[in-house]
Each structure stands twice: as structure tokens, then as C-alpha cells.
């Protein structure tokens, strides 16, 4: 659940910036909503940001996981993936909370720490790094629609009677669907790989026979 508050109060447990929204903080919000009901306040007021102990992301000019600060816009920010893709708020939140999120979403499949680490890495590579790349100007340019552009399309239109915060929540709902599906795909793929590997190890000959179709493991 994501609820956006018009004023700051002690109920607020997360802070990000005001409209317009981008895919990185929308997905960060969707991630956190897996773990707890998100009571969000959108602001750029540095005084509020400096004096809160809530999770702050994509705003505030500070990266410090211990203090629950996850911005990437500040001078000197140096969190970069091995392939050169710079972290944005989606990636920073995922790196901090991804395994916990995966274990929550994969509880019914018995996801343990080892698999959660694999799944978190899979989802980062398949989904989140692309969101971060586009937010940081490292993404592909062109006319094709991306996950990031779909999320951006939910910003309020100037000639429609739309509330920016309601549009933000709608975008978060879309992001949640995409994120949860990607986690399920990752779990399915990794479980499939392990089943295939186990069958190969006990099979003599060049052909393995499975008792059910296992797709999406390549």
C-alpha cells in the first residue's frame, strides 16, 4: 500500500521529491511497499529532510544507508555497478532491501538467503539497472517505449484535472505489478536451472527426461 500525505507528520515513514515523478523513485516506493505500508511525503524542503529519521530517497543530497538516505544527485556520489551503470534511487533501495523483498515475495516458494541473493541480482540486471541507467542519462535513446517511459506517462497532464499525488500512486501500482512479476520470473528461472542441473547429474546419456515442462530457465 502506498499513501501520499499532503503535509508532513509523525505518520510519514518515507520521503521522496515532489512532482514530476520518475521511474527510479516510483520503483523505490513500490519496493518499500512490499515490506511495509508506505506513508509517503513528497518534498524538497531540506529542513524537513534534515530533521527526519524516515527513509529518504532520490532527494536530500545524501547517500548513507545507516541514516536511511538514498540520494544520487549530489556531488561526489560514486556508487557504480561493475559494468559502469551508475546507481539511482531504485538501485540503491534495491541493493539495501532487495534480498528482504525477494524473501517476502518468494516466501511461498521457500526462498532462502542463497536464492534470494541470486534473485536480487537477476532482477537488478533484468529490470533495475535499466531504470537507473535511463535516470542517469546512460540509457538507450530512441522512440521505443521503456518501463521508465511507461511510469513517466503517469505524470499529471497540464490540461487534465489530475492530482499529481494520485498519479504517483497509480504509477506505483504499475511498478509493483512489474516488480513482483520480475521477481517471480527470476525465482522460476533459478529453480528451473537447479532442477535441470540435478537431472543432468543423475542421467546417463545425452537425453534427459523431465516429468514436467520447465520453461524460462535459459
Model-identified regions with their sequence ranges:
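Glycine-rich, Lys/Arg-enriched anion-binding loops that position phosphate/diphosphate groups
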Residues: 123, 134-218
Amino acid at each position: 500500500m502506498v499513501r501520499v500525505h499532503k503535509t508532513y507528520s509523525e505518520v510519514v515513514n518515507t520521503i521522496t521529491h515532489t512532482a514530476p515523478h520518475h521511474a527510479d523513485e516510483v520503483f523505490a516506493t513500490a519496493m518499500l511497499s512490499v515490506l511495509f505500508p508506505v506513508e509517503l511525503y513528497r518534498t524538497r524542503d531540506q529542513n524537513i529532510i534534515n530533521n527526519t529519521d524516515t527513509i529518504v530517497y532520490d532527494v536530500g543530497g545524501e547517500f548513507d544507508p545507516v541514516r536511511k538516505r538514498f540520494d544520487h544527485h549530489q556531488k561526489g556520489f560514486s556508487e557504480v555497478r561493475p559494468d559502469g551503470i551508475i546507481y539511482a534511487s531504485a538501485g540503491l533501495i534495491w541493493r539495501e532491501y532487495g534480498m528482504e523483498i525477494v524473501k517476502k515475495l518468494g516466501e511461498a516458494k521457500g526462498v532462502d538467503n542463497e536464492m534470494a541473493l541470486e534473485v536480487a541480482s537477476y532482477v537488478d540486471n533484468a529490470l533495475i539497472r535499466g531504470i537507473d541507467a535511463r535516470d542517469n542519462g546512460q540509457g538507450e535513446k530512441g522512440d521505443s517505449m521503456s518501463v521508465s517511459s511507461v511510469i513517466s506517462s503517469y505524470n499529471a497532464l497540464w490540461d487534465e484535472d489530475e492530482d499529481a499525488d494520485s498519479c504517483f500512486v497509480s504509477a506505483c501500482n504499475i511498478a509493483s505489478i512489474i516488480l513482483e512479476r520480475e521477481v517471480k520470473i527470476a525465482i522460476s528461472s533459478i529453480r528451473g536451472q537447479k532442477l535441470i542441473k540435478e537431472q543432468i547429474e543423475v542421467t546417463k546419456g545425452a537425453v534427459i527426461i523431465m516429468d514436467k515442462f520447465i520453461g524460462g530457465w535459459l
